[in-house]
Amino acid sequence: MKLRPIWFFCALGLLSFGTAHAETADSEQPIQIFSDKFDGDDVKQVAIYTGDVAVHQGTLEIHGNKLVLTVDPQGYRHAVMTPLKGKLVTFKQRRDQKTPGVEEWMHGKGNELTYDEKRNVLILTHRAEVARSENGVLKDESKGDKITYNLTNSTAIIDGNKAKGPSGRVSTVIAPRDSNMDAGKPLELQGSRRVSP
């Protein structure tokens, strides 16, 4: 089937979100997509993976129940991963090591993970959460109804859901400064930031 280029390049786009801070070697690894079923339509430029879908590239792992990859008439790729009812889409990826002996991981989850190549954004929606851990210890965490990460300028917008009342607010936890850290070195913020449109 001629569909290989469609899902392959869609998957590349889907997986490119982590390259700025992710393990550099991951982008050089093959992309593997596993599922219980695959349906492809070369004419409509659609590839659908269903049933315990797992996407792997190096240390990057994305898990859900359904992955829909499409290419629009202008050639832009779009990918949407959704979970089983009552579950969440999850991803994790190791970051490049900055400090010897410290292994950092990024973890995320939400009801839906979307990659939009035209806008060059990655979006986690509904019960969205992104966290960073060091050697298995949670360091920073951001939660909201929608997390939009712009791959072009490395900015994030986290939106709450006011309709949910106080529980619909955005929350961010930032780890305190490490007492072993050089006092003259600025603290690298790993949480979220709100940017003006």
Language-model regions: role of each:
Residues M1-P197:
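Mature-chain termini and adjacent capping regions
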